[in-house]
């Protein structure tokens, strides 16, 4: 899974390498963070750290981005069904939305054996305003 993902990212990177307004991070970091205006966006495959640990990991791994942003999101991808949890005010963290996204992949033998069947296949995208956080969601069901 990691090798296939890296090879896909590297292929896309090679195709768009001369485009000045497209950037890529194809490092092997398990969690990646990006800022866009007042947004801090984290991403991970979702098979590593627990969902509840993501806000503090974000704050510790990207402290300068954390300090400069107002809206914070972590998008996880490993789960093949829809789950959403909102982390608001708390003792150790506040204001981070952590969300598992649907998968466009079908059920293979492992998913079938473990009962992960029947989930809707989908790709999800988000539009973030530089000033107002996430302002739209797009979902394409297969």
Region annotations inferred by a language model:
Residues 33:
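Catalytic phosphate/metal-binding cores of nucleic-acid and nucleotide-processing enzymes, i.e., regions
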Residues 36-37:
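Structural motif
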Residues 25-27:
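A short, well-structured beta->alpha microelement
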Residues 6, 13-23, 40-142:
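Conserved beta-sheet core of the metallophosphoesterase superfamily
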